[in-house]
Amino acid sequence: MIKFKFIRSISFISFFISSVCFSSMHVKGDEEPSHIAESARASNRGFGYPKLSDVSFSSRRFRPENQKDPHDTFSTLPRFFSTRLDWVYDYGNQENIIGRTNALGLNYNGAISSILPDEIGGFVRIRGRDRSVNGDLSVLAHLPSKPAIGDVWSKQYIKIASNHVREMIRLGADGIQVDDPGMNYAEAVYREGGYGDTSNEKFSLWLKQNSSKKQRRNWSIDLDIDEFSYREWVHSKGGKDHIPPDLKELHEKFLLEGLLQFYETLRKVAAEANGGVQVPFSCNTSSNVVWKDYSKWADFGMAETRMNNISPMKIWRWVCSPERKIGKGHVLCPPRYDALTPPANIVPFTRSCIATTYAMGSLMIVPWDVWQKNNGGPRYFGTAEEYADIYGFVRAIPELFEGYEAVFCRGGGIPTSIYKFNKSPVVLQGNHDGVVAVVRCIPKSESAPVVIHLVDWNKPQSFTLIFDQTQFFFGNKMAFNLFTPTAYDQNLHEKIYAESIFNQLALVKELTPERHPDGKLRLLIPPLNPWGIIKVSLK
């Protein structure tokens, strides 16, 4: 009878590996054995990107915020076995938060945005602000307080942002996350902003240097007029939709130039505050998880996601598709829903998202205090009972995450032909409609174990994994062990955290393959909840 056992040590696992092995394949015809790790390529996810076995926790504000707040940042953080505290805005309480985070040995990444207050810990937003074409302050309209957006050409806002960055680094922050990274450039491109007082003044001189007199005559613009105001000129024409496209393009180019200079300044400020050592900057790459001209400067992305815009295929495209144009990594936020109350499937759906994101070589932030509803609805706070086993599983077996790269994926609509294998290394069979398989290897290693992540997005059922051993370890002897998360138990989890014995957060099960006449191996996989990892080891 097969029994589940806690993982005690590498030597203990080695005992299992040595107990299940298979002789080398007899190669038919001109088919030569190979090793799938030869196809793996190392990824550069960006300066400062988290470890692949990290657990990212986010508390947008320090909690409890008041006596009525039932949530507590630092009592909740260890329940998910967190290694990082990311994307934190609480400027007035930074010394307390960063100090406590550092004392726990965790990585801390503070956040800045387009709506920084004039003073650290303050609430007034007047200095150095962007304006719309009619002269009103540009604001983030989806937030109840309608905070005013900064003008990146303004020395006042540059100073405000620099002060925030400098203070975070001084207190011990390890990195900076930038929310709404498009600032007033994005306001000009997508909304009605981009006409802050400083930008408006500087654009007249910039336009004179970057356009010809003939162009300006065609636009009916006279830059020699004292106190020419581009904002007023556009307003007189009826708004940006009524100005020549080439002029609009130049205005956006000017704002983008200022934005990139703004971030270059903040990088220098952070490095100076850090003793001359560069500090990683990430930025919000939106719920579409895309790199824009205003975000490509960042070292890596921290992206929001939505339930209606996330799937195995989307995660694959975002984090591990061989055809990604920009190789920088993304840390994903858990999927957001747009109703006032969580949908019935929020927990299983989110668990599958978390597992798939890790399986494909990225991280998903713990679903706790991570986004605000546009309509002012309550924030979502997932519990340890719902999600801690998934994150604990990652902490239990970091050696099966670090250094590994996706070399083959299937299921969830992922096109296997993109991987250029003559034959699929693994095939799913049986009740596998919702199963996603990700084969991961350490590039070029002939001896490191291969891992096969399996995530079931449907109601868990047993299914079969067909394994072509001619493509693994040159057809040599192998052993198979299935790792799954230890079920959540509050007392056990608290004990494990207190004693740092994280390997007890995974269970291991020996798998005995069935050899078929075609030479391939069949592995019967038990129901997953929703995640399992097969470790394929060379004997």
Where are these regions (language model features)?
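Boundary/entry segment of secreted carbohydrate-active catalytic domains
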Residues: V27-D86
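Acidic/aromatic-lined carbohydrate-recognition and catalytic surfaces
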Residues: P64-L171, G182-E192, S199-K202, P245
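Catalytic-core region of carbohydrate-active enzymes that cleave or remodel glycosidic bonds
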Residues: G99, A103-G105, L260, R267-P280, ...
